[in-house]
């Protein structure tokens, strides 16, 4: 596809944001000085992976050209002024594997755990367990899928903001969905086979 001048914009990287995936991959994205591109204001841009970021000198202060892949997802098209790369924050214990940083112990990271638990309940079709409710449940001390599956109605009522209606709805949805879940669906939901 040919990229025309109105489909590309130049801006400056203001921040590299690190977010672990449910599989323990530490993915970089960048916050840029806001720009207009194809009728939208762009603030956040995908960087693909760590190797791409590293090889192209993408960090705070880099001048980059942005396009919208498929006129939707903003991504770095070109780096006009590369800069020295900084490592991820020290809170992340990582190693470079292939093109990505991978957490050395992803099960210890609460963001990874939140995303894994949320994905499990999405893949099993449980209603009412979006990320916000999963976070509330984890804040109440139920930090694994097994913990949540074993929760009683009384346990759900200890969760901040949960009343009878919400607690019953989520508990009933869990019981209904887990009973009808097939083995292949359960394998996908648990992510036991990996990425």
Regions found by a protein language model. Name each.
Residues 1-195:
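RNA/tRNA-interacting regions in translation and RNA-turnover enzymes
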């Amino acid at each position: 596809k040919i990229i025309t001048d109105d489909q590309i914009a130049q801006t400056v990287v203001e921040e590299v944001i690190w977010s672990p995936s449910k599989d323990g991959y530490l993915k970089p994205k960048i916050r840029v000085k806001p720009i207009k591109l194809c009728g939208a204001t762009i603030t956040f841009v995908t960087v693909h992976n760590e190797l791409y970021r590293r090889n192209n000198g993408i960090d705070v202060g880099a001048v980059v050209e942005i396009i919208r892949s498929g006129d939707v997802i903003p991504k770095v098209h070109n780096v006009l002024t590369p800069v020295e790369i900084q490592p991820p924050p020290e809170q992340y214990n990582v190693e470079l594997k292939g093109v990505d940083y991978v957490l050395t112990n992803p099960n210890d990271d609460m963001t990874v755990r939140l995303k894994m638990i949320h994905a499990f309940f999405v893949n099993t079709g449980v209603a009412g367990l979006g990320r916000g409710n999963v976070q509330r449940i984890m804040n109440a001390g139920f930090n694994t899928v097994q913990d949540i599956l074993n929760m009683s109605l009384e346990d759900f009522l200890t969760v901040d903001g949960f009343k009878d209606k919400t607690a019953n709805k989520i508990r009933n949805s869990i019981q209904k969905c887990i009973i009808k879940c097939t083995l292949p669906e359960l394998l996908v939901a648990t992510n036991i086979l990996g990425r």
